[in-house]
């Protein structure tokens, strides 16, 4: 490894919207600097999980150290710190930006600026990063670099006269990008003599070494064998292994201010070394931790149940293993009368939920039932403390509570002008409050709405994409809780409430949702030997009901002619039997019924 003085280190990240070519650009940089040998090169080199490759998104952060000889003949060390581009992971993005001094803003020359790019650029500006605009995919026939340059200048206010024209796929403009990193990104501050402070920007669990922590040294020096303390959790560890990532791990003896590396210190779980925590020496600790640390707060909750009750322990183990790698995932055991034993899980957002679900099914071969996602409500009871609930079935009765508040988010949608009407209609049907509308360019518009988070977690994103033919993009952030007339909608099957189908809905929408739910269930629950009523109720008031008629055997088949009383006797006997059955019989609710409830909101 080249030893580099602080003045020749450059730490940068790449900001880009999904599909604008960030991973391909990272591949080219690794190749051009000779960090990864040509024969080892594969597409999306830094995206390690199969899921990341398949969806073409970056989920976990990666880092890579590149040695680069500049045109001035000096040897530089460039540290690329990768960021996830999706809104669910914005805290991780802010931590990895805090570890950098500069950022490449990669924009697709045929598409222009998207909502998530904007959100991340603002984050980068908050951290005072030097931003270098790069127009990617200029080899495409539909590329309009001049229009996109103007768009970046108008929307973000960045001077684009020096923007690099590039095509990561064809390898055009890569040399210019490397030179502009060296000349424009400022070197880290030279604080080698101060007490050690290092920022954790990612960590993952390795079955042999425990948790491996990726960090950037902000002040001071760290050596192999040092005893370190994590300032937020207060725990102390001895460093077993210290090294740099070129993307493969290479051990080194020490790292100083400005450098990026990894360490292993027999840490048991990722929750002990959280993203954003500060590492310092146990013997000579720093006075204050680095700013900006936050606990990850789940926003979306759902129940996960194994379809086969015997798999409950397997599900517990799988969640424990995922939790080792994913500090934002929360779960606790839960039982449901309809589904048996399972877990109530909390996620950062919908994408995070889908990814966890997919990893459980794919990597651990589990068959899962997922209940409808819900958000965290704040309930003020008549007596006692305010408390939070994430499961609709635990909501207290109206006579015991004063008010319910739900979380609201501010949503920014960037869309071509043609789709403004249909997206405004979508936001209004989801109880959105219109706040602002800005024209970014004559063709592109930003719509700003305030919406309840509960209206977004189901399928708002999919609806927005389908209404705008895939051209709109969105970004949201929490703005606090607001009181609304919310009610708990219970679904009763054969007079028994099914807890997994309960939902908290707005009073004005309760009838529509209840009616749709019962008619859907009527189609899906198979007929039994007795009549099954299906009802949607608020408290004790039934607002919608359907019934599934009983299957009947033709008991009169053996009577040809004969007396009517004989027939009546047989029919009465059948009726009495059905009545007895209804009292003791239990109704089988098939798996599809629960899935249909999830899909119901899409229709």
From Swiss-Prot:
Cell compartment(s), UniProt: Cell inner membrane
Xref: Gene3D superfamilies: 3.30.70.240, Elongation factor 4, C-terminal domain, Elongation Factor G (Translational Gtpase), domain 3, P-loop containing nucleotide triphosphate hydrolases, Translation factors
Domain of life: Bacteria
Topological relation to the membrane, as annotated: Peripheral membrane protein
Annotated keywords: Cell inner membrane, Cell membrane, GTP-binding, Hydrolase, Membrane, Nucleotide-binding, Protein biosynthesis
GO biological processes: positive regulation of translation; translation
Main location: membrane
Function recorded in the entry: Required for accurate and efficient protein synthesis under certain stress conditions. May act as a fidelity factor of the translation reaction, by catalyzing a one-codon backward translocation of tRNAs on improperly translocated ribosomes. Back-translocation proceeds from a post-translocation (POST) complex to a pre-translocation (PRE) complex, thus giving elongation factor G a second chance to translocate the tRNAs correctly. Binds to ribosomes in a GTP-dependent manner.
UniProt-recorded name of the protein: Elongation factor 4
Record organism: Cyanothece sp. (strain PCC 7425 / ATCC 29141)
